[in-house]
């Protein structure tokens, strides 16, 4: 399944969560597209709830179905809780950490920065958004890319860095200091439903 490249507000409204991180797309019309007015969302079956939760997490991180399933299966081979490990692996993606560091305003924008070669990891250019960053590795903006307006605007707008990251705004460099705990990951996701979905 190809990655969705259409307007994110449509997906946000359909799933009932903000994928932009701003929440603006839900403020004006907090109901699904095609529904005329803020009536009740139709009640979902157990399968429907599981599918919706999977789609919420998949679209949140901007991952296509093949990558999503592959990461899920990899998480199942790790010690500990399957769902929690799955979310930690998604959080460790390079494009996501570029976004978390405030170098991009959205994950989609972060993915473009990585793909276009503006990001380096431990001093080497990495242009693979799904690259898995390990604790202790540094993520920085290439020196030639530090004057990009899109990065400057993102840094000016950002006012929060998660505790599992450190960031030096002068160097435009951050470090993935440790793996995140479940309490530091998206609270609006019930990963147990996703485990149930793939266990059917």
UniProtKB/Swiss-Prot annotation:
InterPro entries: Ribosomal_uS4, Ribosomal_uS4_bac-type, Ribosomal_uS4_CS, Ribosomal_uS4_N, S4_RNA-bd, S4_RNA-bd_sf. Residues 22-42 are annotated as: Disordered. The keyword Chloroplast does not apply. One of its GO terms (cellular component) is small ribosomal subunit. It holds the Pfam family S4. SMART domains: Ribosomal_S4, S4. Belongs to the universal ribosomal protein uS4 family. One of the primary rRNA binding proteins, it binds directly to 16S rRNA where it nucleates assembly of the body of the 30S subunit. With S5 and S12 plays an important role in translational accuracy. This is Small ribosomal subunit protein uS4. The lineage of its organism: Bacteria, Bacillati, Bacillota, Bacilli, Bacillales.
